[in-house]
Amino acid sequence: MNSSTDNLFAKPYEQVSDFQFDDKVAGVFNDMIRRSVPGYGQIINTIGDLAQKYAATNTKIYDLGCSLGAATLSIRRRVEGRNCQIVAIDNSESMIERCNENLSAYVSETPVELICGDIRDIKIENASLVVLNFTMQFLSPDDRENLLENIYQGLIPGGLLILSEKLYFKEDKIQSTLDDLHLDFKRANGYSELEISQKRSSLENVMKPDTLAEHENRIRSLGFSQFSVWFQCFNFASMVAIK
C-alpha cells in the first residue's frame, strides 16, 4: 500500500483549518497513521487474525470507515473459502478511490462492496464481524450509541465488534503522561514541533475521544455479552465485544 510522506503540516499556517479526510490526506494517510498511531500495524494484522476466528460462513463483514482499506485487506486474506462478503464504507471519495486501487492489486475470491457514504446510514445485517478502526472518535458523541445499536442489531449471535479508538483519561496525571509519551512517539517518527502543534489544532474540533469506561458502559448497555481491551499503547486502544 503505497503512500507519500506526510508533510501536510510542515509549513506554518496563519489559521489551521479543521481536519478533513480530503484528497491531500488520502494521499499521505498510510504514512500519517503509521507515524501517528502506536501499534497500528499490529492492530491491522490482528484484525485479520480475529476475522479468521470469527468470520462465519455465508455472512457479511463490515469495515466502517475503511479509509485506504488496510483492515479490509487484512480480513480478506484470512477469510477465503467461507463465502463471506465484505462491505467497506467511507464518506471520503478520495479514500474510496484509493481503497479500490489497493484492493484491485490483490486477487481474491472474497468480494468487497465499496460504498462511499455515511456509516450512520448503513443498515448492518447478517454480520459476523464489524470493524470500527479509529472511526467512531470522529462522530459526534450523540451518534455513537445509535451506531453501536445498529451494529448490535445486525450482528449474528456470537458475532464480534472490533473497536479501535484514541482514549481520554479523566485522571489528569495519567492523561498528561500518556499524551507526552504519544508526542515523543511522533517526534521519534520525524514529526517536528510545528507539525505536531498544527495537527493537534486541526483535530481539536473534530475528534472527541471517550474514556475506556464510557466505551465499556455504552457497549454493555446495548446487550453485548463480553467486552475486553486486547491492545493498548499509550492513549490508543483496540477493544472487542461479543454479542
From Swiss-Prot:
Keywords: S-adenosyl-L-methionine, Transferase
InterPro entries with a match to the protein in the record: CmoA (IPR005271), Methyltransf_25 (IPR041698), SAM-dependent_MTases_sf (IPR029063)
Gene3D superfamilies (UniProt xref): Vaccinia Virus protein VP39 (3.40.50.150)
Source superkingdom: Bacteria
Record carries keyword Transferase: yes
Class of enzymatic activity (EC top level): transferase
GO MF annotations in UniProt: carboxyl- or carbamoyltransferase activity; S-adenosyl-L-methionine binding
EC number assigned by the record: 2.1.3.-
Pfam families: Methyltransf_25
Presence of the UniProt keyword Translocase in the record: no
Similarity annotation: Belongs to the class I-like SAM-binding methyltransferase superfamily. Cx-SAM synthase family.
Function: Catalyzes the conversion of S-adenosyl-L-methionine (SAM) to carboxy-S-adenosyl-L-methionine (Cx-SAM).
Name under which the protein is recorded: Carboxy-S-adenosyl-L-methionine synthase
Species for this entry: Shewanella halifaxensis (strain HAW-EB4)
